[in-house]
Structure formats: C-alpha cells, structure tokens
UniProtKB/Swiss-Prot annotation:
Keywords: GTP-binding, Host cytoplasm, Host nucleus, Hydrolase, mRNA capping, mRNA processing, Nucleotide-binding, Nucleotidyltransferase, Transferase. Pfam families: LEF-4 (PF05098). The keyword Transmembrane does not apply. Tpase and GTAse regions, and GTase active site inferred by structural homology with vaccinia virus TPase/GTase family. This is mRNA capping enzyme LEF-4. Its main location: host cell. InterPro entries: LEF-4 (IPR007790). Belongs to the baculoviridae LEF-4 family. Residues 1-204 are annotated as: mRNA triphosphatase.
Length: 464
C-alpha cells in the first residue's frame, strides 16, 4: 500500500531450499514452461542495508528506486490447504519501505542480486542469481555465524532469513535461489491465493522426490523442542447431567487414557518417545506431501495402538552451499489448534491406519477424530477414555473428566500418600494394583474418606 514517501508491504513468502542443480531443474522443467516472465531487475544492497532496484524490462516503468526497509512483523505459521495432506510452513512479513534520495546511499555494496519474476495470479515466483554477497558474518565459522545472525535479529527485531549463512560467494560463483511471494493489502491474506501458492510449492517440491532427501537430524533435540499444548482448566462431568455448555465448544474429542508420547514424521521414518521413556520407531511411507519434519503428540494404548492426538510443529530443511542440507532446529513453524484438528480429521478419513512393522509386536497407528458440538456422552467405548478434550471458542484446551485426578507420591514406610504440601493422613487407600512402590507417583482420585489409586505413573517424578 503506497502512502507517497513510504510503502507498507504485507506478504506471505516461502523459500525453496534445495541444491543448485535441483533449483535449475525446477526452473527449466516447471517454472519456465508454466509461467510467464513478468519482470527482471537488479537489487543492489549497500553496506547500510539500503536497497536500490534497477529494472531491466519496461514492466517496471524503468524507474530506479532506493528504499530503506524496516520490518514490523515476522510471523511463522503453518497453512493447511483443505482436503490435502500438505502442511506448508510459511512466513508472514510486514514492512515499511521508505523512499531514499540517491545521495544517502553508500558506494560500498554488500549484495548484488539479479531477479527474474514469474507471475501467476497474485503469486510471484522469484528466481534469483546472487552475484555478490559480503557480510562481516563471513569472518566466522558456520556455528558462530548462525548465533551472531540470530542475536542481531533479536536486537533489531528484523529478519535474518535473507542472510546467506556463511555463503562466501566467490567471484566465479553465482548462487541461485527460488522464493515465492504473495502480497496483499487487506488485514489477512486470501485463502484462495494461499491455496494457489501452496499448490505451486507442492508441485515444485514433488520434482525432487526422486532424490530422497533425508539428512541426518538430531532426533532427541527435536523431540525436546516440542511443546505440547496445555489444558487451561479442568471441568468435572456430573453424572446424569447432559446439559453441557456447548456454546463455548468449538471442537471436541474423547480423552484417551493411555501413555502420552511425542513423535516426528519424516520421509520414510517415524519415531515416538513416550513420557515413560519408551521409544517406538519404524520405517514407513511419507504421510505428508512436503519433505519436512512434522512433530506430533500421541497416546499409546496398551502398546497395541497409537493415536495421533495433536500436530504441534513443522521443522523445515534448510540448504546452504557450505553445510548443505540441515534441519532448522531452532526455527520451527507452530501449527495452530484449528489447523491441527482439521488436518487430523482429514488424515483420519483418508489414511485410516498405518502398521508400524518395525515394532515388536506390530503396532497400529491411527489419527484421532474430532467432532463438532454438541458433546455427546456414550456408555460404551472401544478404547479406554477418561473424559473429553475440548477446544473452546477462544482456542483454549479444556479437560472434561468424570473424576478429577491428582498425582500423589507413595510413602511405603508410613503407608500413606504425599502431596507437595505434605502427607494425606486419615484416608483409606483403595487400589487394584498388585503393589505400591515407595516414592513412586500414582494417579489417584481423592474423596472425603478415601484415596482411590487408578494407575502407576512411571512418567512422573514429583506429585502434582
């Protein structure tokens, strides 16, 4: 949006992160045959980060312009094109471009980039040739350079994604890049345009499937980076009371009573770690269209079935001409609850189940199903459940349970249970478990006179 002396720019962008030969394959076999070349120009960046654009074609009106770009928003999110198995990590940027007189520019350049812009509807496909890129970061090794770049981004509230990580482009090297951009003026992007953009991305990345790109990734580090969503509150279900407050319910599902776990879907591979430190891994066909890492939450039911209950994050592969392919461990894309639920329901309808053949015995993997309100109570379940999981209209998770539970630590010496505040004395202990172990955590229901022990929580170390 042009305001005269400055322009407010809103855009959704995506970078195609592949090696140079694959980028040229995408250009020659997909972009050039299917889309028209709309613009060509040079972008010159001086040592202060000011950009000067020199057009080559008349489509740009042959006006040389210089701007100072200041970022005001940089949001990573995951978009799900409806009725597909694609989770697309995108970046939403908003910036202010202030027009500059040429006298304010420096003669010392830091970047020289030639850009070819191919147009489809409102989507721009940019194929770039980086002829020159110089940065003080190039003086450091790759690890230190990445840390400095991240720190600078935090200090300036800017965007370091344009910085080539330790690229050191030489005089005989021209670095190719492909980016997709969709600019919009409204408060939010148009879903139709996002669907078009995601279809183009899927088509491009499908051309590289035969390469079977699957770099080594730090699995335990990625699992530790995952943050399951928290329940904002817990609500007791009263027996015989069918009057749920459905006005505040957006989606609901059965609360499965299993062992919680976290896992990663990768190309041809899946790994799961449960809260009691059990690992499940198997080779399997890629369930998602794009070659990224999808982090999920699950419930393991009696070591026979695993239900995917939530999709949490997407980790995207990066590429540079020094360290080649690597996973952006510290740059994940969060999946919002609504997107996760819609994708899980689609996978529930279309994937049904997958057998994890590398486990012993074989385990069936399924996607849980979420429902629209109203909540419905059922007297018969084929799996063990202990209530409902509700996503309310404010996109907060709420736990509905028939019996609110507490995690207590057993004291075998005094034959009592302890909370963080001390022992619970004078209550009768009821349990069907063969034995209660000293200083172990158990999930219990507390009444006025009894402590009913439900199950042993090997995944807990302190009472709750």
């Amino acid at each position: 949006m042009d305001y005269g002396d400055f322009v407010i720019e809103k855009e959704i962008s995506y970078s195609i992160n592949f090696s140079q030969d694959l980028l040229y394959k995408i250009l020659n076999s997909y972009i050039v045959p299917n889309y028209s070349l709309a613009q060509q120009y040079f972008d010159l960046y001086d040592e202060n980060g000011f950009r000067t654009r020199i057009p080559i074609q008349s489509a740009c009106n042959n006006i040389i312009s210089s701007v100072k770009k200041t970022n005001s928003k940089h949001k990573k999110f995951v978009y799900w094109p409806k009725d597909t198995n694609a989770l697309v990590p995108l970046v939403w940027r908003e910036s202010k471009e202030i027009k500059l007189p040429y006298k304010t520019l420096s003669h010392n350049l830091s970047k020289i980039i030639k850009v070819y812009v191919y147009q489809h509807d409102k989507i721009e496909i940019k194929f770039e040739h980086v002829y020159f890129s110089k940065s003080d970061i190039d003086l450091f090794d790759s690890t230190m350079a990445n840390k400095i770049s991240k720190l600078l981004t935090l200090l300036e509230n800017g965007d370091a994604s344009e910085t080539l990580q330790n690229s050191q482009v030489g005089s005989d090297e021209i670095l190719a890049r492909i980016r997709l951009e969709y600019e919009f003026d409204d408060d939010a992007p148009d879903d139709a345009q996002l669907n078009v953009m995601c279809n183009i991305i899927a088509d491009m990345e499908a051309l590289t499937d035969a390469q079977n790109i699957s770099p080594f990734v730090p699995l335990t580090t990625l699992i530790d980076k995952m943050a399951p969503r928290k329940f904002e509150r817990e609500q007791k279900i009263v027996y015989g009371d069918d009057a749920f407050d459905n006005a505040s319910v957006k989606k609901w599902a059965l609360k499965l009573d299993g062992m919680r776990g976290r896992g990663l879907f990768m190309r041809n591979f899946c790994i799961i770690q449960t809260d009691d430190m059990q690992f499940y891994k198997t080779k399997m066909a890629n369930l998602f269209a794009l070659n990224n890492i999808v982090a999920f939450q699950c419930e393991v039911m009696d070591k026979q079935k695993i239900y995917i209950t939530d999709l949490l994050q997407v980790f995207k592969y990066k590429y540079n001409n020094r360290t080649q392919y690597e996973c952006g461990v510290n740059a994940s894309y969060a999946i919002d609850p609504v997107t996760a639920i819609e994708c899980i329901n689609y996978m529930n309808n279309n994937v049904q189940s997958v057998t994890l053949t590398d486990t012993c015995p074989a385990i069936e993997l399924r996607f849980q199903q979420f429902f629209d309100p109203p909540l419905q109570q059922s007297n018969y379940m084929t799996v063990s459940v202990d209530g409902y999981v509700v996503l309310d209209t404010e996109l907060r998770y709420v736990k509905y349970k028939w019996m609110p539970t507490t995690e207590l630590e057993y004291d075998a010496v005094n034959k009592s249970f302890n909370t963080l505040n001390g022992p619970l004395n004078g209550l009768m202990i009821l349990t069907d478990l063969p034995e209660l172990l000293h200083e172990n955590i158990y999930e219990c229901v507390i009444t006025d006179t009894t402590i009913n022990v439900l199950k042993h929580r090997r995944d807990r170390i302190v009472p709750n």
